[in-house]
Amino acid sequence: MAKLKKHPTGTIAQNKKARHDYFIEHKFEAGLVLSGWEVKSLRATKVQLVDSYVLLKDGEAWLMGCHITPLKTASTHVIADPTRTRKLLLNQRELEKLTSSVQQKGYACVALSIYWKQHLIKCEIALGKGKKEYDKRHTERERDSDRELQRAVRTKGKDD
């Protein structure tokens, strides 16, 4: 059997849309409660975090909207629900901080990435404030100007 290529940082999936839609203020590392077929699918990077968010309810954190596609070779006697809610494991102090911040207007808790940390699967969640449309355009303009500046620096070095 051929070895699977491992991503150098251990990152399984990223939610780039969350970084585009929110000003990220605080990041937290949370463990995930998963079943066996989900771990196999995550090894094969069959996960999407695009519309995922964190729901804080009854002193617990739940990952909603995360889609983990079951593998064809997964167990047939277990009914796989790709979009089920998954429990996030956080310290009580972190949960209290998230709960108090989310109750403020404009703040949301979103999943940024899922990655390997040694043999465990972790989820990076973030507390963010929603961006307005003009903020998104401003960020895009800054990124474009930085890219142009880098190009100019590179071409100036080649002319010498």
Curated annotation (Swiss-Prot):
Keyword Cytoplasm set for record: yes
Main location: cytoplasm
GO MF annotations, alphabetized: RNA binding
Cellular component GO terms, alphabetical: cytosol
Record bears the keyword Transferase: no
Highest taxon of source: Bacteria
Signal sequence bounds: none
Family matches, as InterPro entries: SmpB, SsrA-bd_prot, SsrA-bd_prot_CS
UniProt xrefs under PROSITE patterns: SSRP
Keyword entries, A-Z: Cytoplasm, RNA-binding
Subcellular location, record wording: Cytoplasm
Single GO BP term: trans-translation
Residue span of region Disordered: 131-160
Main function: Required for rescue of stalled ribosomes mediated by trans-translation. Binds to transfer-messenger RNA (tmRNA), required for stable association of tmRNA with ribosomes. tmRNA and SmpB together mimic tRNA shape, replacing the anticodon stem-loop with SmpB. tmRNA is encoded by the ssrA gene; the 2 termini fold to resemble tRNA(Ala) and it encodes a 'tag peptide', a short internal open reading frame. During trans-translation Ala-aminoacylated tmRNA acts like a tRNA, entering the A-site of stalled ribosomes, displacing the stalled mRNA.
Protein family membership: Belongs to the SmpB family.
Protein name according to UniProt: SsrA-binding protein
